[in-house]
Amino acid sequence: MFASRPVVHPLEVAAPAHPVQQPAPGVLMKDLPGMPGTPGGLGLRVLQLLFAAISLAVMSSTADFASVSAFCYLITTTVLQCVWSLTVAIVDIYALLVKRCLRNRRAVTLFSIGDGITWLVSLSGACAAAGITVLIDADLIMCSENPCASFQTAVAMGFMCCFSLLPSFLLNFYSIASSHG
């Protein structure tokens, strides 16, 4: 039987001049895209601020929002979300401008707790307003008397705000969990 056998010729490669400059194999990235102080994190904060501001503007432009407590609650939660996202976006911009890392355990814990609280509050506000919107639109069939399209748009933007906040919370929470292990 005549089978070809590959011949392996070893290459002589010079060792690196400074082996300490190379990262150890298997090291995880410290700054995941979306973490505080990264361009991805700033992008998520801008999205959160944008969705919350649109929800706030659309809901407050209707004349009937003050008569329904769930709509007032949605406005309150979007104001809270706007303040939180703007504050953290300013911190992200500062960190990017001065090239500082925000991987301090206390800072990431603060961001994670703040993101978790604002996510839950924003989600509850969007769900409450969605329930009333469905009640008005589908059950009571009162859209001729109410601006249902505005209510639905504000609720949709409230949910989009929640969905854009979730990656920030999960990345910060993962960072806290991985730093303790």
Swiss-Prot record:
Q: Where in the cell is it found?
A: Cell membrane
Cytoplasmic-side segments: 1-38, 99-115, 175-181
Lineage here is: Eukaryota, Viridiplantae, Streptophyta, Embryophyta, Tracheophyta
The record ties this protein, via PANTHER family, to: CASP-LIKE PROTEIN 5A1, CASP-LIKE PROTEIN 5B3
Assembly information from the UniProt record: Homodimer and heterodimers.
Entry keywords, A to Z? Cell membrane, Membrane, Transmembrane, Transmembrane helix
Task: Report the family membership.
Answer: Belongs to the Casparian strip membrane proteins (CASP) family.
Descriptive protein name = CASP-like protein 5A2
Q: Which residues lie on this side of the membrane: Extracellular?
A: 60-77, 137-153
**Record's keyword annotation contains Cell membrane:** yes
One matching Pfam family:
CASP_dom
